[in-house]
């Protein structure tokens, strides 16, 4: 970890010769108004910064001053890039928030948010730090404002069910019940008809920044072909399945739901 974590930071900061620039950290500088470059990576790139921050927080149990300084710098950068309402996704901030919350089948917005929350919870639990937690809670509160079963909210979910286990971790760390309620909604809403991914608004220009294009009708790929209580086999992309089935198990555990537990 003493070598890997600093190396990965340099890679994410486009400092390693011979590696294609990712823009991971640079996108936050652009979003904060500190760089005039254009977005040049993938829409999922924010999550790499958050994953690095979680790894760095865990490594800081063993006191590495170089990593601590880099973590502090990253946390400050996130704070500067975050919108006043809590929203924090560099692709959409850089593009003037056009099509925000569109194309969740591919845009990775809630996926990235989930990894921010997980990094914040780890930093709080391991280091007692609240600075990243404040950023994550502000974003989670805004997501709660935008998504849910209530009138006027988006009845949808991300193709990667990463926000769900992250919200359960945030609930268990803070005791704030609305985070569990929102995670419960996401878990139960996935797979209900009409299929969200078939009806959600498309993004007009995100295509060139995607990892790949998904088949429009392949709902099994994202475990969204049926509601979780009607699913009886593990299907789809293994990474997405891991997130979703973990979230479903969390929901069953935290709500003492034996029927869901048996199904999972």
Residue positions per predicted region:
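Glycan-recognition and catalytic cores of secretory/periplasmic carbohydrate-active enzymes
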Residues: 1-264
